[in-house]
Every structure is written in structure tokens, then in C-alpha cells.
Regions:
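Conserved acidic residues
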Residues: 2, 94, 114
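Acidic carboxylate-rich catalytic motifs and surrounding loops in phosphoryl-/glycosyl-chemistry enzymes
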Residues: 63-67, 95-104, 139
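Asp-based, Mg2+/Mn2+-dependent phosphohydrolase catalytic module
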Residues: 120-170
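Conserved Lys-Pro-Asp/Glu-containing loop-to-beta segment of HAD-superfamily phosphomonoesterases
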Residues: 97-127
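Short catalytic/ligand-binding loop motif for oxyanion handling, primarily in non-cytosolic enzymes
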Residues: 13-16, 59, 67-72, 104-108, ...
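Alpha-helical substrate-recognition element adjacent to the catalytic core
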Residues: 3-5, 9-84
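Structural beta-sheet core signal
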Residues: 61-63, 116, 136
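Short, structured coil segments at secondary-structure junctions
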Residues: 92, 112, 130-131
Length: 170
């Protein structure tokens, strides 16, 4: 069965709407990756993911470290991203890859039907060039309307996957 992958920053995690986020990044303060909010309604998202997992889907996260970060800062980022994931979505994701900035995320594809949700156009292009579907989310900085559109797109797409599995089993 396929894996449904999510980026974190700007996709599930609201990095860019935190006060002083850029200053925290520049000061290599890893807490910037654990003190923000979710960009999706947590209980609804968790319910949908749990139902799809019952149908055999796996769920994963592929997220980058900060650009040109030191080993020490990279370890802090990993710690804080995992802290946020475990607090916000406990035991929801089957696999989490926190990798060097710019890593080709399509290297983590596990089946021909894997999909990715990401807000980075270049990431989606690489993913699609590898023969897989990427749902590109819009930049949600300073826009509640765009955040709501992205959340709706995620929920709608996951619901479609759920329906296709149910129809195939009939």
C-alpha cells in the first residue's frame, strides 16, 4: 500500500506566522520548530489519517533542516520537530525523515502510488518528475484564507483516497 507523505514547515506546521520566527532561525533557536501551531484542525486530521491507516495506507513526514545549519543546530531542529509532532499528532505517523535542506524528497518513495503534500514548488516538481503525485499547497504566510484553503485541500484529497479504497473493496 502507498504512503501519504507530508512536509512540515508551511504544510502541517505554522512556522512562518510565529512572531520572531526569522529571528529565531537566524539565532539558531530550535524552539522555533516546536512552539508553533498546526495548519490543520488536529482532531479532524487525526481522525481521517486513522481511518486511512485502517485501510492500509501509511503516513509519513519528510521535512528539511534549516539551510546551512551546523550539526548542533541540526540536532536541535530534529529534537524540536519530533517534539512538536509527538505532542500534536502522537503516534500518527509511521515514519519521519528529517533531512538536510534541499534533499530530493522523492528518494523516500516507497511505492508507485505514494503522494506528497508540500508547499515548495521545486519539491513538487522533483516529486512529480519521479512519476508520483504531489499536491502543492499555497504559501500561507499572513493569510488565514489561504491556510483554510490548504486545510480543505488536504481533507478533500484524503477523503478521495478513502473513497477510492472503499469502492475498490466493494
Amino acid at each position: 500500500m502507498s504512503t501519504i507523505w507530508f512536509d512540515l514547515d508551511g504544510t502541517l506546521y505554522d512556522l512562518y506566522n510565529q512572531p520572531s520566527w526569522l529571528e529565531m532561525l537566524n539565532n539558531e533557536n530550535g524552539k522555533v520548530y516546536s512552539c508553533g501551531n498546526s495548519l490543520v484542525e488536529v482532531s479532524e486530521f487525526s481522525l481521517i489519517v486513522t481511518e486511512l491507516k485502517k485501510q492500509g495506507y501509511k503516513f509519513g513526514v519528510i521535512t528539511w533542516l534549516s539551510r546551512n545549519c551546523s550539526r548542533k543546530y541540526g540536532n536541535s531542529i530534529r529534537y524540536h520537530k519530533l517534539k512538536w509532532l509527538n505532542k500534536t499528532f502522537p503516534n500518527l505517523f509511521d515514519v519521519v525523515h528529517i533531512v538536510k535542506y534541499g534533499t530530493d524528497k522523492s528518494k523516500f518513495v516507497t511505492s508507485e502510488n505514494d503522494i506528497l503534500f508540500d508547499d515548495d514548488e521545486n519539491v513538487c516538481e522533483q516529486w512529480e518528475n519521479s512519476g508520483h503525485k504531489c499536491y502543492r499547497l499555497l504559501d500561507s504566510r499572513n493569510s488565514l484564507g489561504v491556510r483554510l484553503m490548504n486545510e480543505t485541500a488536504i481533507f478533500y484529497t484524503l477523503a478521495k483516497y478513502s473513497e477510492s479504497v472503499l469502492q475498490a473493496s466493494e
